[in-house]
Amino acid sequence: MIKSIPIERILFLDIETVPQAGNWNEISGEEKNLWDKKTLRQRGEDVSAADFYQDRAGIMAEFGKIICISVGMLEKDNRLKIKSFYGDNEKKLLEDFGNIFNSPRLQNIILCAHNGKEFDFPWIARRMLINGFQPPVPFQTFGKKPWEISHLDTMELWKFGDWKSFISLELMAHIFGVPTPKDDIDGSMVAEIYYQEKDLQRIVEYCEKDVLTLANVFRKMRQEDLLTKSE
């Protein structure tokens, strides 16, 4: 029962990712060749490797980078304290993020994200390795039994064993009556906003709002009241 999980131990998390380069012509010939090979089956022969790069490189850890990680934890006043790590320097971002796990409060932390088991958690671990860091203990799953891995995933919790099911965080928020801001941005627009509009702060705000939405969806699944963000 998820209601028995101590919510004060949960680190709610969301990441925003983009392709490593703003356009196809900025990557090396070797990387173009590797991208072509890796994605041929997914895109088919009708879609060029260049077009597919613009659309999909930001969701593959080998060809993308993290530009924002937002995390939230419950405070004693029942507000969610949110902190973001962001910037153009991914290595510095990941180093700063990794350092929070040195805190005594985070020694027995439980990670929670929407589709986190297939996206956020492995993405962070892979990008840390690529940048020369060992992922913090909560991200290391090798050799652990399934019940020893402290990961929560609201998408997985909603499946109830129906592994064909996919549901967006936005839809979960809607069905549970969780208020969400009517932003003019969604995940598919992040790369354009980052590379063309150069508005990273707008992306950070979007990421933080998703963390609050995530926490409130989780609360609703436990039949608990909504949280507000701590200022």
Predicted regions and their residues:
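Conserved RNase H-like, two-metal-ion catalytic cores of nucleic-acid enzymes
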Residues: 1-99, 103
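Metal-dependent phosphoesterase core characteristic of DEDDh/y 3'-5' exonuclease domains
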Residues: 4-8, 64-88, 104-205, 209-231
